[in-house]
Amino acid sequence: MINDEGRIRIYFGSGPFRNMRCEGWKKYILSHVYSRVFNKPSSSFLTHPGPLGANVGELEDDMLTLSSKPKRILSENYGMHSFFEGASIRKVRDKYFFVYSSSLNHELCYAISDYPDRDFKFMGTIISNGDVGYEGRKERDRVNATGTIHGSIEKIGDDWYVFYHRLTGGSDYSRQVCAERIEINEDYHITQVPLTSLGMDSKCLGELPPP
């Protein structure tokens, strides 16, 4: 989705997607899902290369036609922090920030570049919906149920925030929209922030009375 001078445009895939890069049970399940959804034989679901990655394509002025063949913009050599889904790009000063949900599934990571379509360098994790990685915390010590996360960063006034969702009730399908204040240093580094209940408020709202 983009805001094109006041006009909101929403883009979505039509499929079927071929050559998806999966292994094992994921490949088996996805091949049958695409077969049923798009009425195609599961044999059309191949293994390489595929659209499961961070890709970019330049649009013509009609905002529909691709002017060039899509290309992969994010390296797969980020270890456990490789791209999974939820691509979002922002311009911060003279750098492009690519924010995404990593393959760990519970964290928003980011990479930066001088260009919007190439040469991105992995920088780190912005937030985890279980505080995994914050001050060295391991996943076994997570402070909340971990699972699917989406979001991005935005500047409001003079401050930057990360908007994301965390899980409630221990369910991956019960999601609470949240915001945390972040700081982007002169070297474009964002230190991972913890989960709080402050949201966009700058001060603590107080403590709950004892039961």
Regions found by a protein language model. Give the residues of each.
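Carbohydrate-active catalytic/glycan-binding domains of CAZyme proteins
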Residues: 1-211
